[in-house]
C-alpha cells in the first residue's frame, strides 16, 4: 500500500518515515498498559500529567523538525518521541506511587498457570468487546486517511491528515477531565450514589463541550495561520477544519455516554460501533470514489455514519437512566463547574 500511494515520489525518505512510524506505533501499543496501571492504582492525575508532557514534547519536536524541513521523517520522529517520553514517565510515576516499586520487589508471589487461566476467563467476557470497540474506533479514524490517499491528491491528503491531527489533539485534551473522573464515577455507580453520579457526569460532559468549543476556535483563529506560516502549502480551509473538528467532537461525546455504561460492565454498544464503522468506510468509498466529493466526502461520511444511530441513541439510554434530559444535564454541569471555580478562589 505504501509503495502504491508513494509511487511518484523519489528517494527513500518516505519509506524511512514509514519504518520509524511503525516502530513508534508498536512502542505506543506495547507500553500502553502503563496507563491502565497508573489509573488502576489511583494515580489518575499523574497519568494525565504524563499525557500532557508527552504531547508537548511531541509538538515541540514536530515544530523543530518542520522548521528544519525534514518532512515526513520529522513527523515520524516526533511521534516516536511521544512514545518514548510516555513510556519513561509512566514507569517513573508508577514505581514511585505509594512505594509500589519497593513493594513489588519485596513480593515473592509467582502466579501459577491455573490462576492465570482463571483470570483470563474472567476478563475475556468483556475484554474482547472492548477490543472490538477499539478496533471500530481505529477503523473509523484511520480509514479516512487511507481512502483520501486513494482518491485525493497528495496535497489534499496532507491537509486532511493535519486537520484530523489538530482536531484530535483538541478533543483529547478536552476529554482528559472526563477520563480523570472515571474512577470517581465507577465508585459512585457501584455504591449507587445517584446524586454524585449525576453531578460528576454532568460536570465532565459540560467541561468537555466547553473546552472543545474554545480549543476549536483557537485552532481556527490561531493554529491555522501558524501552520501556514511554518508550511505555506498547508492551507487548511475553515470549513474543512470545522467539519473534521465536529466529527472528532461527536466521537468523544458519544464515548462519554458509552464509557458511563462500561463503568457498570455493560458493553452493550459494541455491535453498533462495529456496524457503523463499516457503514462509515462504505460511505467514504462511495462519496470519494464514485461522487468525487474530495475531503468533504470523508467528513460527510464520517459524520453521517455516527449521526444515524450512535450519537443520539447511547446518550438517550443514559439520560433515561439518570432521569434527566440533555438540557438538564448541561444546566447541572454548568452549576457544578461554577461551584468548583468559586471554591478554588475562596
Model region roles, listed by residue range:
Residues 3-6, 64-69, 131, 138-169, ...:
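Helix-terminus/linker motif at the lipid-water interface of multi-pass membrane proteins
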Residues 40, 98-102, 163, 167-192, ...:
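Helix-loop junctions and terminal segments of transmembrane helices
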Residues 72-78, 88-141, 192-196, 320-345:
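Interhelical loop/hinge segments that connect adjacent transmembrane helices in multipass membrane
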Residues 72-77, 118-126, 130, 147-168, ...:
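Interfacial/gating helices of multi-pass transporter permease domains
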